[in-house]
Structure formats: structure tokens, C-alpha cells
């Protein structure tokens, strides 16, 4: 940056900028240059930033800054040493990012020595890294896209980079299939945000930067970004869980209604009962699963690819392996209910009780399945830290309370009748097997993995 100013002692051009650029403009002998470079290296090796200043006296007719700088022969004024220390929590956060599969790349306008020392202090640059892991902006700009794509996976630092280098680097990373997040608080970072999957700035950034960014963090900390990643991955898993639960319940309901129409004379569910079932599957259970708190285990997983769909083979397999047995149980019970209700002399009250039991068994199956789905995709028990999940607790309580109220007081509107407390207990603990069997299977698999971490060993 250069500016012309009139002072009491005359007319001057003042220059500030990168020490290398200022050195080229100054009139220095070899000894002065050696001392200058030695001073810069001393502070850069400590991770400090440097900014040099120079000036030149002008004649009254000299007004073109570009011509003045081209002529050179400026007088060196001095160098500002700026200490921008790394926060104490940064190395630990960088280590957690590495475990989470997040690769941190530093693209900076600083000198290579300064950038490397800052990266080393932060934990980005390791002892095993070498010159293949860093490049200057000038070298990067000279490369073709094919050449750059070949070396980008190894690059950790781009020093003396321009905003254009940062933009191109983000574009090429995305070409490699990476999910790219760019951080920056400067106006020069605005164009880069549009070429990344998400642009991140801090709360103290300029208004224009905030408007362009996809995410704004109030605390200017890398840990905040890591926490956002944990929340994002948790929300993604929770979305998959609620889809597994909803589709399992809906497939079970569809198959039961369809096959019952073919095999039985009894209508499995009334319209009012279907409304309550829909409220459970599409609202209460969804809220319960989506409000599950974030787990630190999410930071031990690798990032998912762009090509991965929400509905995977695991999702489909879980839906089928759960809904088909549920359907079989319900159809067997419906046939038993129909057989009992067609016995000669059976009272209408008993018929309603049998149908109320069938209705309640369906709801209890979904109740226990909701608890199982909470543990789906994890290695934990379904009851692990269960009482910290307030949304899940509230949802399961509402299901039990709502079902009890509808059966006991629904009457003809819901085709239900009062059931004895012993009957409620029988249904509750009989359907408990829906939870116990998968939980026991997970426990056995967990025990097997602990004994054989590398799988089954055969001779």
C-alpha cells in the first residue's frame, strides 16, 4: 500500500507492506539486506507477523504513485513486529478435528516461515511434514488445475496467498469431492465464500462479510466450529433415526391394513385410531428423536461423502427387519381377536376389550421401537444417558398417557373400552421383547468385538 502526503518537511510517498516487497523498493547495500533478512527470520521463526515501512521524498511535479514505486530507491523506515499468539485450546481442538476427519488447511498472506511456525504451534504442521506439504501462492498460481489437483491432498499451507489463490484452492478441493468450509473476516474473503460449501465468519466481522457468509459464530474460536460440526452430524443422525421410525410404523400399518382386508372381516383400526397413530409417528416421536442431544462420539466418525443418501441399505434393512415381524405379530393377534369375537354369545363389551387390546399392542410396539431407534447407529445401549434426553422422555410419556386416556375414556369415538390394570401390565411387558431382543443382540455383538477387535480369528 502506498500513499502520497504533504508534510512540513516536504512531499513524501509512504509505503507499507510485506517485507520482501518493501525490500525490493528500498535502496539497501548487501550488508543492510543481510541484517534486514536476519531480523525478519528471527521473528518469523517465533511465529510473529512482520510489516515493513519505507518512504521517499518527492518533487512537486511527482504525482504518479506507480511511477515513483517503479523508480525505487526508497528509504527504509522500520518493521513492525506483530505478535498474534495461538490460543491455548487450539492444539487440542486441532487434534479433535483430525480425529473427526476434518483436514485443516492454512491459506494466508503471511511469509512461509511465519505461517509454518503458526501451523506448528497450532498442531496443524507436524514433525513428519516436509516441503511437499507447503507451497507459496506464486507457485500455486503457476500450476495448471491438473497439476494442482495432484498435490492438493498433501498441501497444508499456502503462504503469500492472494484471495484468488484461496478461491481457486476451495474450488479444486470441491473437485476432489471434499466438503469445503472457508473461514474469513475480511472483505476479500467474500468471493471465496460462494465457491465453498459453507462460508464461516465471526460475529465481529464486517456487515458485508456477515451477509455473504453461510454461518456466523459469535465466539471467534475453532472449537465453536468443531461444536457446530458435532451438532450438524447429530442432527443428520437424528433425521435418519426419525425416518427409520416413521417408515417402520407406516410400513407396518400399511401391511396390516392391506393383509387384514384380505384375510379378516374385522377392520384393524378406525379413522380416529389412525389419527392418534399418525400423531405418534409423525409428530410426537419425530420431535422426541430430533431433540436428542449431541454426542461426542460423532467426532470420532469420518465425514460423509456428497454421494451418500439419507436412505441407505442399512435404513431399508432396519425398516424391513422390524416392520415385517411387527406385521406378523399384529396379523396373528387380529385373527385371534376375530376368532374370539365371533364366538357364540360373546358380549359386545368383551369384543371392544379385545379390539382395545389389539389397538394398544400396536402402540406399545411403536413405543418400544422408539427406544430401540434411539440407539440405532450407535454402539451404546438404548438407555445410555436416557434421562438426559428430555425430549425423548416427554415423548414416550405422552404416548403412554395418550394411549391410556383414549382406551379408558375414548368410548365409541375410538372403539375402545376400559381395560384392567393387569391387562395393561401384560401388554406392556409382553411387547417389551421388542426392546429386549435388539438390545441383547447389541450387547452380544459389543462383547464379541471387545474380545475379538479384529474380527473372528480362525485357524
PLM features: what roles do these ranges have?
Residues 1-34, 39-172, 176, 190, ...:
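Cytosolic catalytic headpieces and adjacent flexible linkers of membrane translocases
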Residues 122, 126-182, 186, 196-378:
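Membrane-embedded transport module
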Residues 296-302, 343, 380-383, 446-457:
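Short, Lys/Arg-enriched, Gly/Pro-containing loop segments at transmembrane-helix junctions
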Residues 311, 315-316, 378-398:
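C-terminal membrane-solvent junction of multi-pass transporters and transport-like membrane proteins
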Residues 329-335, 397-412:
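Hydrophobic alpha-helical transmembrane segments in multi-pass integral membrane proteins
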Residues 347-353, 386, 418-423:
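Interfacial loop-to-helix junctions that mark the boundaries of transmembrane helices
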Residues 366-370, 434-443:
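Alpha-helical transmembrane segments
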Residues 408-425:
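Extracellular/periplasmic helix-loop-helix junctions in multi-pass membrane proteins
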Amino acid at each position: 500500500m502506498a500513499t502520497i502526503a504533504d508534510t512540513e518537511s516536504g512531499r513524501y510517498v509512504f509505503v507499507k507492506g510485506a517485507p520482501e516487497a518493501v525490500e525490493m523498493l528500498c535502496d539497501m547495500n548487501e550488508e543492510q539486506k543481510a541484517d534486514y533478512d536476519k531480523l525478519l527470520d528471527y521473528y518469523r521463526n517465533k511465529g510473529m507477523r512482520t510489516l515493513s515501512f519505507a518512504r521517499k521524498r518527492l518533487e512537486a511535479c511527482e504525482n504518479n504513485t506507480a511511477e515513483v514505486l517503479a523508480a525505487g530507491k526508497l528509504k527504509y523506515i522500520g518493521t513492525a513486529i506483530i505478535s498474534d499468539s495461538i490460543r491455548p485450546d487450539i492444539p487440542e481442538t486441532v487434534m479433535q478435528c483430525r480425529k473427526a476427519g476434518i483436514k485443516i488447511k492454512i491459506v494466508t498472506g503471511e511469509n512461509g516461515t511465519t505461517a509454518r511456525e503458526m501451523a506448528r504451534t497450532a498442531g496443524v504442521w507436524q514433525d513428519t511434514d516436509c516441503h511437499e506439504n507447503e507451497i507459496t501462492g506464486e507457485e500455486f498460481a503457476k500450476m495448471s488445475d491438473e497439476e494442482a489437483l495432484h498435490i492438493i491432498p498433501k498441501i497444508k499451507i499456502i503462504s503469500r496467498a492472494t484471495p484468488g489463490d484461496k478461491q481457486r484452492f476451495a474450488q479444486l478441493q470441491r473437485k476432489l469431492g471434499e466438503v469445503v468450509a472457508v473461514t474469513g473476516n475480511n472483505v476479500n474473503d467474500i468471493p471465496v465464500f460462494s465457491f465453498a460449501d459453507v462460508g464461516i465468519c465471526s460475529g465481529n466481522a464486517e456487515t458485508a462479510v456477515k451477509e455473504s457468509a453461510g454461518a456466523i459464530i459469535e465466539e471467534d474460536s475453532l472449537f465453536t466450529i468443531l461444536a457446530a460440526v458435532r451438532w450438524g452430524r447429530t442432527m443428520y443422525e437424528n433425521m435418519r433415526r426419525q425416518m427409520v421410525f416413521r417408515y417402520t410404523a407406516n410400513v407396518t400399518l400399511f401391511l396390516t391394513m392391506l393383509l387384514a382386508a384380505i384375510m379378516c372381516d374385522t377392520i384393524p383400526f378406525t379413522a380416529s385410531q389412525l389419527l392418534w397413530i399418525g400423531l405418534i409417528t409423525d409428530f410426537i416421536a419425530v420431535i422426541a428423536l430430533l431433540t436428542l442431544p449431541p454426542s461426542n462420539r460423532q467426532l470420532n466418525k469420518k465425514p460423509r461423502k456428497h454421494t451418500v443418501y439419507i436412505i441407505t441399505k442399512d435404513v431399508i434393512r432396519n425398516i424391513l427387519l422390524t416392520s415385517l415381524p411387527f406385521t406378523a405379530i399384529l396379523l396373528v393377534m387380529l385373527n385371534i381377536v376375530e376368532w374370539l369375537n365371533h364366538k357364540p354369545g360373546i358380549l359386545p363389551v368383551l369384543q371392544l376389550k379385545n379390539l382395545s387390546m389389539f389397538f394398544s399392542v400396536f402402540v406399545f410396539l411403536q413405543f418400544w421401537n422408539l427406544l430401540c431407534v434411539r440407539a440405532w447407529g450407535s454402539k451404546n445401549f438404548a438407555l445410555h444417558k436416557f434421562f438426559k434426553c428430555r425430549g425423548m422422555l416427554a415423548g414416550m410419556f405422552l404416548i403412554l398417557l395418550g394411549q391410556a386416556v383414549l382406551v379408558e375414556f375414548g368410548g365409541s369415538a375410538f372403539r375402545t373400552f376400559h381395560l384392567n390394570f393387569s391387562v395393561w401390565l401384560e401388554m406392556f411387558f409382553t411387547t417389551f421383547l421388542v426392546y429386549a431382543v435388539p438390545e441383547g443382540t447389541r450387547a452380544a455383538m459389543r462383547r464379541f468385538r471387545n474380545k475379538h477387535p479384529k474380527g473372528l480369528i480362525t485357524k
